[in-house]
A protein has these predicted regions:
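Catalytic Walker B motif of ABC-type/P-loop ATPase nucleotide-binding domains
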Residues: 32-36
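Conserved ABC ATPase signature
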Residues: 7-11, 15
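Helix N-cap at the start of a conserved alpha-helix in ABC-type nucleotide-binding domains
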Residues: 43-45
Length: 121
């Protein structure tokens, strides 16, 4: 609220990221494409925004592009990884979204994603 009169170029990267996410949330579309929506946020705000988005996007089809394996493991119902060898489907943790960062199945999935990302042909 304190920034509502500011022009976009006067906002920080994280503030602009939050405005973009808020605009997307307000549109109410059944299909949503999010390209690195949490990338410019600090860890605390990132976790809060992930939780907010997960709740507000429940029941919608969401394609989330991320370079963060932990984020994919925490938020993904279906996970694909693209690396030098192609496109790979990964089984996500079986617990419901939004998963705790430190849950064993989330950590195992994150490890699997990191190993796959590090593969070289």
């Amino acid at each position: 609220a304190a920034h509502r009169h500011k022009k976009p170029n006067a906002l920080s990267g994280g503030q602009r990221q939050r405005v973009a996410l808020a605009r997307t949330l307000m549109e109410g579309r059944p299909i949503v494409l999010l390209d690195e929506p949490f990338s410019a946020l600090d860890a605390k705000i990132r976790a809060e925004m992930q939780e907010l988005a997960a709740g507000l996007f429940a029941g919608k089809t969401v394609c989330l592009i991320t370079h963060d394996p932990g984020e994919a493991a925490r938020l993904g119902d279906v996970i694909f990884v693209m690396n030098a060898t192609g496109l790979h489907s990964i089984t996500p943790p079986s617990s419901p979204v939004i998963r705790p960062y430190d849950a064993p199945d989330v950590l195992a999935c994150q490890g699997q994603l990191l190993r796959l990302l590090r593969e070289t042909p």
